[in-house]
Amino acid sequence: MMTPSQQAQAITNDAGQLTQRVERLAQLAVGIGANVQPGQIVAIGLDAGQEPISRAVAEAAYARGAKFVDLSYFDPHVKRSRLRHAPRETLGFVPPWIGERILAIGEAGAARISFQGPVEPHLLDGIDPELLGIDMLPRTREAIAVTNGQQTNWCILPFPTPGWAELVHPELEPDDAYERLWQQVEWILRLNEPDPVAAWEARLEQLAGIAAKLNGLGLDHLRYNGPDTELTVGLLPGSTWISGAMESIHGVRFTANLPTEEAFTAPDPRRVDGFVTATKPLLIPGAAPIEGLKVRFEAGRAVQIDADNGAETLRAMCAKDEGAARLGEVALVDRESRVGQSGTAFYSILLDENAACHLALGSAYPFSVADGPDRARANQSSIHIDFMVGSDRVTVTGVRADGSEVALLRDGEFVV
């Protein structure tokens, strides 16, 4: 048994280690992540309970010469109160100044940094799942517009919290679960490397090479085959495969997601047919994970959505507008992904989508379609919902317009 002085020292050591971890994460966010520029405004978006990382990012951003750091907190407790008591017909209302602020951030060419990882994962348990598909906050249509217009350099990263750790590792004691989650996030983000930036630059170069190979194949559509999955996803003639490194309209290079393990593009929203089974839980912020998701497509539209639980939430979201029930993104991920190698379901869109091939219902990223008439054909919507469809048992084959085929993924590995 430790003496009181030993206990106090252990607490001090733990606090010091946590501070160092948070500071390293903040440096990654403002560096190879968002790539904050001198004189730039930095907008940080977080949930209540993520204050330590916001302060560390502010410190790191100002040290890089930021002009102003703007913090925006979203409190899911307030959302819970709204969902419990507000009239149903008001749940889709978003005050105009929320969107106006985001548009102003875009017009200013600011840097945007946000963090994922639920602080209280079970807070909205018991809420009608359909209501969760109506109240989309903190997501907004304006944020999608700013992102698609490449007006800002931005980055989304994970931030471990004790509540999230207990969700991911319920088999461990709370303190052990928190430590385990931090260790995994550090490894996935390459923060355990002697030079995390150099490690990410090497990985980004690998992903860029994969995207270049895919772009050289002249593919007309993709075919997915696996357990309870037979899906064909058409591509536009101008569909362009993109990897993690991006550039804003102001010429600032950045990495939008850390981690990033994908090559992605925008499909033809009217040429998707067949059925697909999700290989990991579908995650909608604030809602319980949707398990056992199965979606059937006809002529591009999701015409049937079933799940073991929570299907009502996704159905409500897919009814929001014309493009919500169509695909806006197709992304390929292989087993080189550290997220996938961890063998852990993180219940985080950011992490889990980088563990396996995935599709997204809703808005496309227009910059993943070559400039020209095809760009206007990319899907448009007020939502963007990723769900994972890849595993070692799911094959992905590329098919050219002449019917010739090329294997893309076999046993979870790129074979192009």
Residue ranges: model-predicted function:
Residues 377-416:
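Extended hydrophobic packing segments that form well-structured cores
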Residues 302-373, 379:
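Dual-mode signal for accessory low-complexity, basic/Gly-rich regions
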Residues 234, 305-306, 409:
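Short linear motifs in exposed loops
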Residues 264-319:
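Long, well-ordered mid-to-C-terminal structural blocks that present hydrophobic/aromatic surfaces
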Residues 215-220, 289-291, 388-395:
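A short, compositionally biased
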Residues 117-119, 160, 228, 237, ...:
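A broadly conserved detector of short glycine/acidic/proline-rich loop/turn motifs that flank catalytic sites
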Residues 269-270, 286-289, 296-297, 321-325, ...:
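A structural signal for short secondary-structure junctions
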Residues 2-273, 398, 404-406, 414-416:
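Active-site bordering "gate/hinge" segments
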